[in-house]
């Protein structure tokens, strides 16, 4: 009793007994179900296929570059050759670009080209149009050809140009008219025919560069009436300011000179000369007043560090009061020099530019 009470009081032992009974009943039921099911016939084994049972192709679909023909596989028939292809792949082998020294039809079996001329029809020749024209002219005994004869030479010697003639013939005409090395020669009276001849310039060797003629456009005709030389262009300036160096007598100064201007023949003289004389006379009066002021001037006075504008206003008033027209003066009177002293730079600047201010500090450092 005590033993039974201990067994029933242990819950884990009871669970183990229940699980053992459950698995015993499940295995017994599964065996009974297997005995009641009918026996199915076993499926026949799949037939085996070998590489030798495939029919050999008519030709090898692969193109090999300079490679030998493929023979039977040593793993199948014991022969020598590539071990990766079955028997039958070497009979109709086609080779691509086998090693050969010459060009022939057998070298390119994938191209339906019977001869070399048909191949040249597909490839454009490596020559410019100027080179084609030069070759056609040089290969004739007379060294001259008409435009139609140049067309015929190019089409006969270069089969590529037999098609689409409109395009390259237009380029031939374009190069003939724009290239300086091609010269047009008129026909003789006793030479019947149509069109002028074209020949090569004797100096065309200088235009020849690496087998191609350099394209040069013809120069335009000189402009009518442009016969003035450089000297005449310089004479067009009626007035000129020349700066004398410090080594010249009188020190550095600015000299106003009047250059003579001669109008070309057959043309009316320009009124620039009279205007220049008026301007030079006005400037002469202004410069003379400046010299008088400089010779009798007092030392400069500075006020509050600013420039003095009174003199500049006086100069502007005198410049505005100059007459527009005045009688002509001699060449000696037109040469007026500024005051030559050690302050000539500032004085000449004041003469040329009336708007410039006086220096705040003198060159000696005076304040």
UniProtKB/Swiss-Prot annotation:
SUPFAM superfamilies: Winged helix' DNA-binding domain. One of its GO terms (molecular function) is RNA polymerase II cis-regulatory region sequence-specific DNA binding. Residues 124-218 bind DNA. GO terms for cellular component: nucleus. Its main location: nucleus. Keywords: Activator, DNA-binding, Nucleus, Transcription, Transcription regulation. It is found in: Nucleus. Residues 31-40 have a biased composition (Low complexity). InterPro entries: Fork_head_dom, FOX_domain-containing, TF_fork_head_CS_2, WH-like_DNA-bd_sf, WH_DNA-bd_sf. Residues 31-51, 224-254 are annotated as: Disordered. Pfam families: Forkhead. GO terms for biological process: anatomical structure morphogenesis; cell differentiation; regulation of transcription by RNA polymerase II. Possible transcriptional activator. This is Forkhead box protein I2-B. The gene is foxi2-b.
């Amino acid at each position: 009793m005590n033993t039974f009470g201990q067994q029933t009081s242990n819950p884990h032992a009871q669970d183990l007994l229940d699980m053992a009974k459950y698995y015993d009943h499940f295995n017994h039921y599964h065996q009974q179900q297997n005995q009641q099911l009918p026996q199915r016939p076993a499926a026949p084994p799949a037939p085996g296929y070998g590489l030798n049972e495939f029919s050999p192709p008519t030709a090898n679909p692969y193109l090999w570059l300079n490679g030998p023909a493929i023979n039977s596989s040593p793993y199948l028939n014991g022969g020598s050759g590539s071990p990766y292809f079955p028997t039958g792949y070497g009979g109709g082998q086609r080779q691509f670009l086998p090693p050969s020294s010459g060009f022939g039809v057998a070298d390119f079996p994938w191209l339906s080209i019977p001869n070399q001329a048909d191949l040249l029809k597909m490839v454009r020749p490596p020559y410019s149009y100027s080179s084609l024209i030069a070759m056609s002219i040089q290969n004739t005994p007379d060294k001259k050809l008409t435009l139609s004869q140049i067309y015929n030479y190019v089409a006969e010697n270069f089969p590529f140009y037999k098609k689409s003639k409109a395009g390259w013939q237009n380029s031939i005409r374009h190069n003939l008219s724009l290239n300086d090395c091609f010269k047009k020669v008129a026909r003789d009276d006793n030479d019947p025919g149509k069109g002028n001849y074209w020949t090569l310039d004797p100096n065309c060797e200088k235009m020849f560069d690496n087998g191609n003629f350099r394209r040069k456009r013809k120069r335009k005709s000189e402009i009518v009436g442009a016969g003035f030389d450089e000297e005449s262009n310089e004479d067009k300036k009626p007035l000129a300011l020349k700066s004398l160096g410090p080594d010249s007598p009188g020190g550095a100064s600015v000299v106003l000179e009047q250059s003579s201007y001669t109008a070309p023949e057959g043309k009316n003289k320009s009124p620039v000369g009279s205007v220049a004389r008026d301007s030079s006379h006005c400037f002469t009066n202004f410069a003379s007043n400046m010299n008088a002021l400089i010779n009798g001037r007092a030392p400069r006075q500075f006020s509050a560090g600013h420039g003095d504008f009174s003199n500049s206003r006086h100069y502007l008033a005198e410049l505005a009061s100059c007459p527009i027209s005045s009688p002509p003066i001699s060449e000696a009177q037109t040469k007026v020099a500024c005051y030559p002293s050690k302050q000539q730079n500032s004085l000449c600047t004041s003469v040329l530019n009336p708007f410039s201010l006086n220096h705040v500090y003198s060159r000696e450092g005076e304040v």
